[in-house]
């Protein structure tokens, strides 16, 4: 949306979630395996720049295989489906005010504490036999307007003033 603030958007997951984003230690350059960062209970994450002050929001366990980035008032945005991916991460530049949010379905992750250096021991890595291949798919679809494509959960939760509350 033209002239929209970052905070005018939210992430809407297809399923109810009860999970956490793994915290990132910028000094170690690793995700902290035993820690829990941002907690997601429900389907909606209202965006703020401060969510990304410690790096990406990386969800190592997520039930949804579809998420939408939605403008709260217009309902416009994008839907990303990732049926073949096990995890997802979201990031933007912080503290700068970049005009984007990166949505990255992952199989694997950045380095985690205690994981070691061998690729085969990394989380969510798939092993393929020599010469084998494995296809993964994802799709990005524009959300045109609230009435046409906005996920039902958000449509029900929008207040008349454009605000949002949990369903």
Predicted regions and their residues:
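Active-site/ligand-binding surface loops and adjacent short beta/alpha elements
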Residues: 1-83
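Residue-level signal for secondary-structure boundary sites
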Residues: 19, 88, 111, 144-146
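Hydrophobic residues positioned within well-ordered beta-strands of beta-sheet architectures
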Residues: 65-67, 101, 136-138
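Glycine-rich active-site loops that engage anionic ligands at enzyme catalytic sites
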Residues: 70-114
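Short alpha-helix capping/helix-loop boundary micro-motifs
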Residues: 119-123
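Short Pro-Gly-centered flexible turn/kink motifs
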Residues: 126-144
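Terminal connector regions
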Residues: 145-167
């Amino acid at each position: 949306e033209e002239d929209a603030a970052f905070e005018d958007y939210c992430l809407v997951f297809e399923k109810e979630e009860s999970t956490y984003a793994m915290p990132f230690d910028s000094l170690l350059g690793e995700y902290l395996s035993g820690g829990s960062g941002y907690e997601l209970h429900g389907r909606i994450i209202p965006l703020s720049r401060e969510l990304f002050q410690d790096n990406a929001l990386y969800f190592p366990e997520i039930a949804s295989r579809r998420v939408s980035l939605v403008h709260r008032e217009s309902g416009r945005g994008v839907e990303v489906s990732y049926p073949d991916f096990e995890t997802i991460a979201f990031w933007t530049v912080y503290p700068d005010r970049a005009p984007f949010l990166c949505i990255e379905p992952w199989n694997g992750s950045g380095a985690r504490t205690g994981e070691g250096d061998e690729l085969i021991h990394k989380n969510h890595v798939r092993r393929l036999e020599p010469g084998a291949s494995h296809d993964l798919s994802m799709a990005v679809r524009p959300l045109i307007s609230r009435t046409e494509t906005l996920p039902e959960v958000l449509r029900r939760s929008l207040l008349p003033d454009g605000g949002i509350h949990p369903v």
